[in-house]
Each structure stands twice: as structure tokens, then as C-alpha cells.
Amino acid sequence: MSKTIDYEKIPGHWLLASLGKTVLRPGGLNLTKKMLDQLNITKDDHVVEFAPGLGVTARLTLQHDPHYTAIEQNEDAANKVRSYLTGSRQQCHIGTAEKTGLPDNSATIVYGEAMLTMQSAKQKQQIIAEAKRILKPGGKYAIHEMCLAPENIDNALKESIQKDLSVAIRVNARPLTIAEWKQVLEEEGFIVTEVKTAPMHLLRPKRMIQDEGLPGVIKIASKVICNPKARKRVLKMRAQFTKYEQYIQGVTMVAQLPEK
């Protein structure tokens, strides 16, 4: 596999996945679980997940046996998702978070993680608008993203963080403050009901053990040690996360549409 990966250009999340990391969300598995707890998913829900990827959150959701629809961008990604889906109540469609192809008012819960942070302001709005379109009145939309702190963070510092993170992870990173995240949701008619944060410790040993377990961390570490090019990229990412750790966090928000 290492022969086919350009370690200099591959997006950071796929680099980490190639090394065996399964939890790639900014607030870690614990914050994901808090998000799901607030959603209170039951077998009567119709759940839509944008870009489930490796499926860590999807598997937690499926424990509650809801109607479940994943949205993935291409057939290769969709087939990976379908490998852990079972039964007629679980499916994966080809589409994007901006254009799912799903009917209006067809879901009771929609969520996406580590997605909006990487989008422009216009794309953020389009994705949130699509979540609104496919949700039934009273439906819930949850996000798990990266946020900036404090609320009055200096604009020059914000730009430096966005630039340095984008260079390190090879994907445009446009995190917002908590107030800004709430604003983009409220502009589409959502009412934010829950906000929870966690430190952005994605590559810290303690968080990695919490997320991956000790055997998983040992396996990841051995791959990093044996792959100089991958190690160089991982260390660059970790250096930027550490440099700005007092200004970046993981955040999850649950927002609800009004009942009609």
C-alpha cells in the first residue's frame, strides 16, 4: 500500500486511516458518543449520515436499529460502507452532502462529522440547507466539527490557524467559533439545543488510547516508525495541533427544526 500513496499530498485524515487510525473526529470518540446520546436514536427514526467513512459512528448508530441511509460520493466509498450494513433498513446512496438525492422531509435525524470544517462558507450553507430539506419538521441535525476559541479570537490569528492547518492536513480547514457555528445553523432555521466541546487532542497518546485502545495504538505506532515519509507528515500535523491547541477544540452541536 505504501507504494501507491503520495505521503506528501494525501489528505491528513486518509493518511491517518492508512496507518490504522479509525477515529478521525476532532473531539474523539467520546464526543461522538455524547452527540449520539443527545440524538437519542430509536428504531423508529430515519437516520441519514453524511460521509460515514470508516463507519465508527455508523456502527454505534446501528446498534439502535433505526432506518439508516448513508451518503457517500462514489461507488468505492459506498461499497466500503455497504460491507457493514445489513438488512433492508440499512442502505448507502451515491450523492453529496450538498445534493443527497433523497426526498424532502424523509429523515428524522441527520448528522455529519469532520465535514463542514473543510468547506467554504457557501458550501457550509449548502450542506446545512440540504440537511434542512430532507428533515421532517421537528427533525434533528447534529454536527461534530473543529471550533476556534475564544469567541473574540483575533482575525489575524484565525487566518494563521486556518492557513497552517490547511498546509499540514492538505485540506482547506475553515473552523469557526462556537457562536459562528450556531449562527450558520440558525440562519437555515435550526434551533441549537445542545453544545459540547472537547480538546483537539487527535494525536495525543492519551486520546489515541481512548479512541483506538492500546493494541490499536501500538499497531499505528509501529507503522509510523517503519514509514519515514508517513512519520514526517504525522509529526507536521501533530506540531500544528500542538502549536494551536489553546485555540482549537472539537465541538458537537445538536440543532432542531421547529415543529409545524
Question: What annotation goes with each model-predicted range?
Answer:
Residues E98-V110:
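A short acidic, Gly/Pro-enriched loop at the edge of an enzyme's catalytic core
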Residues E194-K260:
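Conserved Class I S-adenosyl-L-methionine
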Residues P52-K99:
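Class I SAM-dependent methyltransferase SAM/SAH-binding core
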Residues K43-G53, A142-D164:
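Conserved class I S-adenosyl-L-methionine
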Residues Q125-K140:
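A short glycine-rich, Lys/Arg-flanked "PGG" loop and its adjoining helix->strand segment in the class I
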Residues R25-K43:
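Conserved alpha-helix/loop element of class I SAM-dependent methyltransferases that forms part
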